[in-house]
Amino acid sequence: MSLNQDQVFQYEREGYVFPIDVLTPAEVATCRESLEAAEMESGGKLPPAYRAKSHLLFKWLDDVIRDRRVLDPIEQLIGPNILCWNTIFWIKDASSESFVSWHQDNTYWGLSSDKVVTAWLALSPAQTENGCMRVMPG
């Protein structure tokens, strides 16, 4: 999987590019099932301690972050030698009042490099009703 020139230009101009379909619907469903199984093992909700750096806890997620279909587009944007600094589960049900205020990931995280990419993988439909992600160009 690679980005076309229009997608690369959009990223350079706007700071984001989406959607990039990297996993099949069946693979996404398997990821969701794995997450839901982990939630059930934890009593119905994934504990906060399991929601960050989750690729260190769940082999299936570690496999996703190492998948060439995920890494190749990122490499096109920031170059090789990619480090996955964090993975986060932001689990938000429809009509939930939880939110994340506007922010810039690179500034928010306090990392020293400007070669930072957020690769967001939706495991459920992203709709207005459940507070889908919004991006601001630039």
Predicted regions and their residues:
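Non-heme Fe(II)-dependent double-stranded beta-helix
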Residues: 1-111
